[in-house]
Every structure is written in C-alpha cells, then in structure tokens.
C-alpha cells in the first residue's frame, strides 16, 4: 500500500539521483529554516538507520550510538558549561579584587582566598590580613589618609578602564557577535533563523574572556544573560560533532534549547528554573524529549559547577538565603507596592534603553563603540568608588541586601541598637531600633539606587557582553531593602498601630528586610524580562522553601501586570524588534479580523505572482526569472491558464540543480525544457535534451484558502514553523504568504513600521 | 483593506442571521472538537468584548471582569481542590483507624487525634492511650490473646467489606464515571474528546465520597490519581460558571489542564511537580499563559491544604524526608539496579493489568463488578491483616520505609544493635549490625512485596476509584528498603572490601536505607507511568534538596529505558488504547513512509467521496445524503466534474440549518435548491425559493496534497488539533482524512487492530 515510487515528500530529495548534490538542504545566512522539512529529513535519516541496523551488528551498534548521541551531547554541554561558569566566577573574583589590591603570597589569589591562607583567620580580622595589600600600601606604603584614598581611587579607575578597553577591543577585532546578552538573538535563532558565526567557537572564546573583563571592570552589568549565550555556543560546538545534529537545523535547535537551560542553571544554580526559563522564555520548539534532556544537561552543569566550588561554600545557588521568621498577611501590601515599582522600573528601563539603542543605531554615536565603553566605564568607576554599595561587585551587593541580620553580622546594614538587657540568641533576634550605620546605609543605598537606574540604561546594549539580570535585581534589591527597613522601623516604633498590633509585639522578630530585598529583586527582574513561572521557580530554588513563594509570586504578578499595562514587550522582544529579526512570538495574540487574501502577495495592482510551469519553461526562462526576482522559491503550476498548483521549488535548490545539470549532465543547454512531472513532456524531434527537476520539487506545499482568517494563518506559521504558505481559491493558486509578510502584517496591525522587519 | 463582507472564517457563523440558531458550535457526545475553530471562536468573542468595551464604562468593567475571570477560576479551583483534598485526608485517617478501633472521647477522632487529647502524651506511650479502644477491648473487654486477635481480625475484614461494598454500589448507582483513576480519560478529554458527565457534579461528589471509602477499606490503591480527576471536576464546575469557558471547549480545556496541576499539587504537596505533571503527562494544548495560571492554581491548592493541615505537622508534602548523610558514587550501582527493577515491574504490571482488564471487558467477569470488588477486598483484608506492613495504610508504610532511622525511632525496622560504649548523638548514627527486628521486618517486607505486586494488578481497573501512584511507590519502596538494608549490612560487615573501603569506615554512617526506598519508589512509579521530569521534580520537592536528585534521576532514567525496551506505552496510554479512545499521543513518533494518499478515504475500489455541490443540490438530495451516510461533514465543491474545493460543511450544522429553515423560512420545500455561494444561482422561473447556507460553510477547510508524507499529516493533526483534513491533487478534491483514519492508520502500522479505535 505504500506508494514508494511517488514518495517525494518535502524531505525526500532522492528519487532521481542516489546522492543529492552538495549543499542541498542547507540554508543561507539570515534566512529562516523550514521546520516541517527539517523534521521530515530527520525522520528519513532515522528510518534509514533503523532499516540498516538490521543488516549487521556493526550497523546495529551504530544505530545505538546514534540513539545515545543526544544524551552524550547533553553530558558534554553540562560539563563544559559548568566548567566555564566556574572558571568565569573564579576569574571575576580575582580580577574584581585586583582593582583594590593584590595578594602578596600569590598574586592570583583573590582577597578572600588570600586571607584564608593567612593565619589570622578569626572572624573579625578576616578583612584585615597582612598578606592582602591595597595598592596604596604596596606602592606608597600608606593604608590610611587622603593621599592613600586618592591613589586607591585612581588605581580602581585605571584597572576598570583597562579591563573595559581590553574587552571592547577584543569584541571588535575578533568576535563582533560576542556583544550584548545574546538572549534576543538566541530566541530568534531558536525560532528558526540562521545567523552564521553567532554561536561559533570564536564567539565562545571571546565572550568568555570579555565577560570576565567587563564584569570585573565594575560596569553595571551581569554575567547571567551572557552565560546563556556561552552555554549555547557550547551546545552548538558539541552538536557540530554529531552528524545527527550538525546536518539538521531543527535537531540542532533542540540541543540549543537544552544548552540555554544549562546556562541559566549555572548562572543561578537553579536547574529546574533553568529548564523552565528555556521553556518559557527562550525556546520555540520544545518537545517533551527535549524537556527531559534539558533537565539532564542543567543538572550536569549545576553539579559540575558545584564540584568546582567557586564560591568556596559548596552552595549551588548564587544567593543562598535563610530566613528565620514567617511573613504576615499585612506585609502583602508593601510586597505589592514593590511589584508596582518593579513594573514601573521595567517600563522605564525598556523605553529609555530602546530609545538610547535606537539613537546609537541611527546617529554618529554608533561609530565610536570603544570610546563609548571607555566613557561609560570611567563615569561608572568615578561615581561608584566613593559609595561602598556601588564599589563592591553587584552580586556581593545583592547578597548582602538579601541577608537577614544575624547576631554576628558586622555589616553597616545590621547596625541596630541592641537592648543591653537582652542575651543574644543566634537566630530570632527581635526587631530593634536602627543605629547610625543603618541610617548612613539608607542614604548610600538611595544614591546607589539612582546611580544604578541611570547607568544601567546606558550600559545595556554597548558593544561588550552585558547581562541585565544582576543590575535589575540590584535595583529591586536596593529598593526592597529600603522599604523593608522602613517597614521594620515603623513596626518597631508604632507596634500599637492597628495594622501592626496583631502580628508585631515588642520583642518579636516580625519584619525581615532581606525578604523585601528579595521580593523587590524578583519584581524588577520580572518587570524587565516579563518572566513568570521561571522567575518564581528560580527564586524558589534560591530560598529553597515554599514558605516565601507567595510574596514572590504576588510581586511578580503585580510587576508583570503593571509593566504590561504600558507595553507588552519585554526587553528581549524589544531588542528583537529593534534589530528587525523575523521572530514570530508565541505569546503575541493576533486578534485582528484580516484574511489571508489581505496579506498575500501579489497585492491588487501588483504584477502577477512569479510561477514556474510544470513542463513548458526552458532553462533560460528560469534563469532569467531567478535573476530578475529575489524570491526564495517559486510555486509550480500545471499551466499559466489553469493555475492549478503542483508544488513548490526553492530558489537555492533551483540554482544548484541547474548549475549541477549544466556541469554534469550532457545535452543541457539554455533552451532545454525543464519539467517537474514524472514523465518528460512530448517535445519536437530536434529539441534539446530536457531537464528533469522533480527531485527538487516539494510536492506537498502548504496551502490555505484566501478566506482563511489571519489568526489561523499566524497559528499555522507558529506551530508548524513554516517559511511560506500558498494561497488558493477553489483550487487555483492566488498568491503566497511568507513569514516576512506575516510579520509585516502584524507590525502594521500594531501600528508599527512594517519595514522594520528586515530579514526573511 | 479588511474584506468584512467575505469574513466567514471557521469561527464566524453570522454573516447572514444576526443570531445563530441554538446548538450551533456545540459538539455531540463522544466526538472530537476542532481546536482551530474553538480558538477562532474565542478570538471573535474577545474582539467583540474589546470593541464593546470602548462604548461605555459598564462594558469596560465587563471586559475587565472577563479578562480577570481566568484568575478567579484558578483561585476557586485551588481553594476547592485544596479543601477537598484536606477533607479526604481527614476522613481517610479516621475511617482507616475505625477498622481497628474507636475513640471513646469522640468517635470522630482518629487514633492519633484521640491520643493527642489524652493526657499521657509522652513519646513512648503515645500509641497506648486509654481513650483509644480496639474493637476487642470495646466489645469483649480483651486486649490480648487469640480470641481478641480473631475478633479484631474479623472486625477489620467486616469494615473493609462494608466500605468497599458502599463504594462500589454508590459508583454503580450514581456515577459510573467515578471509577478508575480517571487520568486516561482526562488525557483524552484534554486532547479534545467530549465525554459528557465525566467531569460532572455527580462524578465529583461520588468520586470524593467513594475515594474515602476505598482508601479506608485497605485495598491496594491510592488517592493521588483520583484526586486529579476530582480537581478536574472542580475545574469543570467552575468553568461552567463563566461563559468564556463554558461556551468554548478549547478554553475549557485550558482550565482543566490547570486543575490537573492543582490535583497533583495537593496529592503530593508538590506545586511545581504538579504543573510539570500536567504539562508532561496530561495536557495536550498547554500555552504559556496556562502554565502561569496552573502554577497559581497549584499554589493556592497547596496552601489551602496546608492551612487545613490534615497531617497535623504543617508540612505541605505527603512524605517529608530528611537524610543526614550524602550518597556515594559506588551506591549508583544499587540505585541503577533498583531502576531496572522498576522498569521490569512497570512492564509486568502493565502487561498483566491490561490482560486482566481485557478479560474483564470481554468475558462474563465484567458483569459482576460488585462481586469482584467484594472478593478482592475480602482477599486483600484476609491476607493483609496478619502482616503489620500490609495492615497499616499504604502511605504510612511508604512514610516508614522512607524514614532514616533516628536515635528515637522505635520502629521494628530500626531495631539495630547499638554499641553500648557509644553515646547516642541525635543525628549521624553510624552503621550498626541489624537486630532481630530488622530480620523479621525483612521477611515481612518480602511477603508484603509479593502480596502488593499481585493484588495491585487485580485491583487497578475495578469499578471503584483507584489510583496507582501509591501502590507502585509502595512496591518500589519495599524493594528499595530491602536492598538498602542489604547494602548497609554488607558494608558494615565487610568494610574492608575494595568497593566499601573508600567511603565506609567502621563507625561511619555510610548507607541510608531510607534513600534506597525513595529511589525504588521513584523507579517503580516511573516504570508504570513513564513520567520523567515531573517524577524527579515531585521527588525533589519531597526531599527538598538537590543533594539526592542524582540517584533519583539515575533510577528514573534506567527504569524508563528498561520499561521502554519492552513496550513504549505507559499504563495510561495502555488504558486509552484498551478503551479505544481517539487519542493522538504527542510522544509517539510516526516514522513510516506512507503518504496521505494511502490513508485518505475513499480507498481504491470504494464508492466516491460524498460531496455537496455549491449550487445544484436540492434540500431533499442533501437530506437523503445525510440519512444514508454517517460522516461528520461534507466537502463542498464547485461541481462534480471539476471537483474544485470550496469549503466544508458540518453534518450537525447542516441538519440544524435545514430544520431551522424548514420551520422558520417561508417557501423552503424539499426540492428547494441549496446554495453555498454569495449570490443565488440562476433558477427557472417556477422553481421554489432557494436556501442560502453560506453561513454554515467553513470557507477555510484544511487541505494537504496527496503526496504529503503521513508524518507531516500526523504532525498537523497533533499541532493544530484538526478533526479532518481534505486531500487534493493539483487543486482537485481527492478524499478526506479524519482523526479516526489517522489513528487507525497508526494502529495498523504498529501491527495493532485498527478497529480498536472506536470513536471519531
């Protein structure tokens, strides 16, 4: 019952020659892949292996290896991503401290490592160990005083400038794709776009190195987003080792989805959150098999990172938090306020950052990327140094803000006035009045907040690797901690107020300012990225308990609603639009009442559709058509009169087939007839040898009728991953809709410039 | 540019009459819905609300309410599902203890609650409090001795029989759909099938009550699967309150997916695991919006359950576990062995259970469901009572097996010989030689294992609510604990062996038998259900730490591989096939080289396809066609000669339209011409008034060419949720492929009986 002779689905190109000519089935740079066709090709490959595996033991083993290669790739990705993340963490640690001083015993030790080896490791003296010397101590032998301060200040700025200059130069010279967070581009690539070199080996190497440099330089950026890019580069590298993945753009994207999960997993130490991030934010086609493998890759990466143990505390997570008191219903109000703040911050950041990036693209500003980086770094360093909360690295800052004030905490933020009558228990310290340190800290935090807000807008989008998870979280954490301290002091001084009376007696520990910082961080991150489930799960993995999930969720939901009210796009989608990538978002709902006939080409008044006929055009006709148009493919019809559709031929394959036939097949000349039918057409006796091209004809092109609502067409494009779709009415070919047409139509309907969609 | 006059997409039925006649757009029982059409209808509804909302403030508020209704439904589902789960837990607790005795102070207290209120609440005497009386004490005033034992034995059996009889009678009389776990049917319903009453209010009520009865009766079944059904009934109930969900079968299924997540969330106290379970196992169409809402519903449900606090320990999770020692690499070998065991158990269970269920369906056995339940209950009770590990409830058993032996543990399983020279630390007890109790326990556990394996096969599928999560986990936990104790004793007595030497010194706590039980439970559950990510995440939420995720994952992966080697179907898919539901599994890969032309109807030699012409058939012709065939719809073509496709008309809507026209429109008689075009056809002067039916015509039917590979067709059916698809060649209509045809073809290709697919 299987009609094998007629078997020539979209993936089968081999009913004529045994070996397809080279390059058939590949795509050009900046083009969109055809998911159905990739899937079909993979099934063909799989069928071949399965049928071969019955022939001999060797083939059977090969088929087993093929089946296992997916897991092997995941293992390798996990190992490499985890290792790179560990190395980056260690290097950043060392280089950040290098800005302040150097370790005498071994210059490659960071401040903390240097003082570990020192003998005086009592808790109080940990920060002052003789082996660690500030630059002023080393150079002019002064540790205090104005001149020492100025010297250290200068050294700080110099190192920052050096790191930033090195980073931007490396990116410019070796790997221009290494800049930015990479997530917008990865989203586009995963949706089926080709950007050659974006996930290449050079990008991997340069991004890893420059990431260390820029993070150490103290710029307001994080390593989390770029780590996703680095992990995807690893994924791309390993998938190129296995023909199953290297030769199939669809399968390769399954590996990349898993790699993205591994990237987030190592960035936060949150494997489940990483998988959900990949599912929710990054991936386009995410079958359940990939879910399982992503989970595996994310776990391997997390455990590799843990065995490297860069933080020296065998914790998996970036910010480990442990709170001792529950939260109370009345606290939901400040939590929701923080959510509103997060939403507003998200909106402000996206608008300002996009406006600034557009200006960079369109004005002369974009011509001096090195200068821009140097200037921003200099300003950042100059303003950051005097304030202790901006001088320290942003992850340390967040960590400090998240922390609950224990009894042994020496930080300025924990400078509360203790009741002398009270013995100090280790946990469960009651709310106390704030001391001088806390008030100073509040001022410094307020300044740090303004500084971070402004400088992050200008930093994200420069020609260096830059993530915005950490800066966003920092903004939220600062705001949250300030609100938290405010509520705490209010509750301490006014515990007879009706809102506090029920849950905040004197002597009780009722408000945890660290929790507010965490809630604020989640809200701000949510406002910028519009993540939902993955955000809450990542935060859940940080705290490790369901206890605090309700505050986090309340803030995340509020922040998303507030931000969505001002604009549906998250920062990544906004950057995708800014760059004009052909990305068909799964989350956008198309609700307009247009029909396929309104979108298809040719429009009314335009010249008719360029088609091929099945058996009446010469090679020259086709070559002229190819030269005169730049369409990616041509529908093939029975004849120009009947316009009944037979199939679809890709431009690239037509060109290759004709070139190949002219070189290899005898008797093919310019006026040879090209035919797509099974049998050659009846030709006059003296006509040249005709050229059969059935093998490059896609006999199952996708068609819709002209009355199909566009919402259905959009759905089909999204779910099946089409490149183009033909439009018919009562069996006659009317026109064609490409992915670009769909995107332009959607932009037009949303009152945006349709010409902003640049690629096909 | 919007061609509004011609706007008649699949969802728009209103281009002629303002109000569609009743019942248009609904589906018959045991039919499949058309997802694209449901989606399109929802978009129409949404558009209408959005455009109306600009008219007045009242309409704007209504549109806000509509937008919020999704969250309200989720909140209500979470609240009700959590409450029901809490009530079920409390009732089961009480009724399970009722089989053994009664509380004198208040008969509605369970054993534990009874002894809480008692004054003698020291730890050792907790089990013996005077207020709790065994039946023998109460009835004949004897607590020890053979006659007391026999009396208690009899009472145990009597109560079990009473509970089981009540349950099976209630199910038979009031709600036949309340039987089984419900998950296979819910999977089918979520994939787009209609089973009226399956999620009705009666089913909800009866399933809740009978679930308590059967779990208390001591049968080898669990409440976890049925809780998913109960939660889905809640979801169905609340979605019927909002027209957004009640009138759209597609939207309703989004709510049901979230409800399933809430069900698992309360079953295990694992909200994230619940969402992933819904995503991985149950749901079919799971957009990201639903993911977020499911998470919300799952959280609300979990917190509602926690505030009810049925276990009295304010723990959210069903089995809370805390281990004190890490695992070692060498232990991976027994863990993988447990995985193999789990896979073998899964295969054995599925094969035997399906064979037994098939026998029940086909022989006289199925005619006596009450007797069957009584007999199985009697046998279960008689065998279970003498063995303490089968007498206690299965969840208590699992809980005990998971537990690490602490210093204060009085259980038989923790009867180790202590070193008298050693002081007893609270945690971190070194490995010790097993005492007599442990050896007795091993024998009893072995017997319990055999008993559970056999009896579960016969229990699952009877006409009572029955889940198999708990029995499967029990089988695995018993096997795991036995292996764990074995490894522990081996390591204790032979710590000089090379495999133990590196990690198991004398006096160290190296093996945790409880962890083996947990790994075994995961492996067995994985073997039966073939869950992957959700299984690991549920287990992760039980232990609450990433520490033990690698052993769990190793066992889950092994178990899935071993079980898959013997057959790809999990127990739920196997039951779906057994019942012949039209379920198109997303996980099955279709790899055969067939084409659409091989599957479409009519086959070669069959009578031609029944079609309607656009303007030449009379009402009578159509009525005859409808009477003579039972197709769900008919393609409409220009004329029988050209066979050019215009659209598709649903049978149900044709019948309704003709009935309606005959009643309401004047001049419609049997030989009126029916036309589907915009303009009426030119008719002879004396012909009766024609009937315009364009509004029921779907102008955008889905078409594929006859050369389309079936793998693509299957993909399209899956991803777009089609009911049928028309097959064309060069614009001519050749045939039709329905979902049933696809399923039959897939069954045939897998060498199964294609007639087993029963519904359309």
Curated annotation (Swiss-Prot), chains A, B:
Gene Ontology process terms (BP): chloride transport; monoatomic ion transmembrane transport; non-motile cilium assembly
Lineage: Eukaryota, Metazoa, Chordata, Craniata, Vertebrata
Major subcellular site: membrane
Subcellular localization, as worded in the UniProt entry: Early endosome membrane; Late endosome membrane; Endoplasmic reticulum membrane; Lysosome membrane
Motif (Selectivity filter part_1): 180-184
Stated consequence of mutating residue 275 to M: In MRXSRC; marked reduction in outwardly-rectifying currents; does not affect its localization in endoplasmic reticulum
Similarity section: Belongs to the chloride channel (TC 2.A.49) family. ClC-4/CLCN4 subfamily.
Expression sites (tissue/organ): Abundant in skeletal muscle and also detectable in brain and heart.
Effect of residue 221 to P: In MRXSRC; marked reduction in outwardly-rectifying currents; does not affect its localization in endoplasmic reticulum membrane
Known partners and oligomeric status: Monomer. Forms heterodimers with CLCN3.
Chain segments annotated as transmembrane: 68-105, 151-174, 200-218, 224-243, 291-309, 333-358, 365-385, 442-462, 467-486, 548-566
Binding site for ATP: 610, 631-633, 738-741
Name of this protein: H(+)/Cl(-) exchange transporter 4
Gene3D superfamilies attached to this UniProt entry: 3.10.580.20, 3.90.1280.20, Clc chloride channel
Function statement: Strongly outwardly rectifying, electrogenic H(+)/Cl(-)exchanger which mediates the exchange of chloride ions against protons. The CLC channel family contains both chloride channels and proton-coupled anion transporters that exchange chloride or another anion for protons. The presence of conserved gating glutamate residues is typical for family members that function as antiporters.
Residue numbers marked as site, Mediates proton transfer from the outer aqueous phase to the interior of the protein: 224
């Amino acid at each position: 019952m299987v009609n094998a002779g007629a078997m020539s689905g979209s993936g089968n190109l081999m009913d004529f020659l045994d070996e397809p000519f080279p390059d058939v089935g590949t795509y050009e740079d900046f083009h969109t892949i055809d998911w159905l066709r990739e899937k079909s090709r993979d099934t063909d490959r799989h069928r071949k292996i399965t049928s071969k595996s019955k022939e001999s033991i060797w083939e059977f083993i090969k088929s087993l290896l093929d089946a296992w290669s997916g897991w092997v790739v995941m293992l390798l990705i996990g190992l490499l991503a985890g290792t790179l993340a560990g190395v980056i963490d260690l290097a950043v640690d060392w280089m950040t401290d290098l800005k302040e001083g150097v370790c005498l015993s071994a210059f490659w030790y960071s401040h903390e490592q240097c003082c570990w080896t020192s003998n005086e490791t009592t808790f109080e003296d940990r920060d002052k160990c003789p082996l660690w010397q500030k630059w002023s101590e080393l150079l002019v032998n002064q540790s205090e005083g104005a001149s020492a301060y100025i010297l250290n200040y200068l050294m700080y700025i110099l190192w920052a400038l050096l790191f930033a200059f090195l980073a931007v130069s490396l990116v410019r010279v070796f790997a221009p794709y290494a800049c930015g967070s990479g997530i917008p581009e990865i989203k586009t690539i995963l949706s089926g776009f080709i950007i050659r070199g974006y996930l290449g080996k050079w990008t991997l190497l340069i991004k890893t190195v420059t990431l260390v440099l820029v993070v150490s330089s103290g710029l307001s950026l994080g390593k989390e987003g770029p780590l996703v890019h680095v992990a995807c580069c690893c994924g791309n590298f390993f998938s190129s080792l296995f023909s199953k993945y290297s030769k199939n753009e669809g399968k390769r994207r399954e590996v990349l989805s898993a790699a993205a999960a591994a990237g987030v997993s190592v960035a936060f130490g949150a494997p489940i959150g990483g998988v959900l991030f990949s599912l929710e934010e990054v991936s386009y086609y995410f079958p359940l098999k990939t879910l399982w493998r992503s989970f595996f890759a994310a776990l391997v990466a997390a455990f590799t990172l843990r065995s490297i143990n860069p933080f020296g505390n065998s914790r998996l997570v970036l910010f480990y938090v442990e709170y001792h008191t529950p939260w109370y219903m009345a606290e939901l109000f400040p939590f929701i306020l923080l959510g509103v703040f997060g939403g507003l911050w998200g909106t402000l950041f996206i608008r300002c950052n996009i406006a600034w990036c557009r200006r960079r693209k369109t004005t002369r500003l974009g011509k001096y990327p090195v200068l821009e980086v140097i200037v921003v770094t200099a300003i950042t360093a100059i303003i950051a140094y005097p304030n202790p909360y901006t001088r320290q690295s942003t992850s340390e800052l967040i960590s400090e803000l998240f922390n609950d004030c224990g009894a042994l905490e020496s930080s300025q933020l924990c400078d509360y006035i203790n009741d002398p009558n009270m013995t100090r228990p280790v946990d469960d310290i009651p709310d106390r009045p704030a001391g001088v340190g806390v008030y100073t800290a509040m001022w410094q935090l307020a300044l740090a907040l303004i500084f971070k807000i402004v400088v992050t807008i200008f930093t994200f989008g420069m020609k260096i690797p830059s993530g915005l998870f950490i800066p966003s979280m920092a903004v939220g954490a600062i705001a949250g901690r300030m609100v938290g301290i405010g509520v705490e002091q209010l509750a301490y001084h006014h515990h007879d107020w009706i809102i506090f009376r029920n849950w905040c007696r004197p002597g009780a520990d009722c408000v945890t300012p660290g929790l507010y910082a965490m809630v604020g961080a989640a809200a701000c991150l949510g406002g910028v990225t519009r993540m939902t489930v993955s955000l809450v799960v990542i935060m859940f993995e940080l705290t490790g308990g369901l206890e605090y999930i309700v505050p986090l969720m309340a803030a995340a939901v509020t922040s998303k609603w507030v931000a969505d009210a001002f604009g549906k796009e998250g920062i990544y989608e906004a950057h995708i639009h800014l760059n004009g990538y052909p990305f068909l978002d799964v989350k956008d709902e198309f609700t307009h009442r247009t029909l396929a006939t309104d979108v298809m080409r040719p429009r009314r008044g335009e010249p008719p559709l360029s088609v091929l006929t099945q058996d009446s055009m010469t090679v020259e006709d086709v070559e002229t058509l190819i030269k005169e148009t730049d369409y990616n493919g041509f529908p093939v019809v029975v004849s120009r009169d009947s316009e009944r559709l037979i199939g679809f031929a890709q431009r690239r394959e037509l060109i290759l087939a004709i070139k190949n036939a002219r070189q290899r097949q005898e008797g093919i000349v310019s006026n040879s007839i090209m035919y797509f039918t099974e049998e050659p057409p009846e030709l006059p006796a003296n006509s040249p040898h005709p050229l059969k091209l059935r093998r490059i004809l896609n006999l199952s092109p996708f068609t819709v009728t002209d009355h199909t609502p566009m919402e259905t067409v959009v759905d089909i494009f999204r779910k099946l991953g089409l490149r183009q779709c033909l439009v018919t009415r009562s069996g006659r070919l009317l026109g064609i809709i490409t992915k670009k047409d769909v995107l332009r139509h959607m932009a037009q309907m949303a009152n945006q410039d349709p010409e902003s969609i640049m690629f096909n």
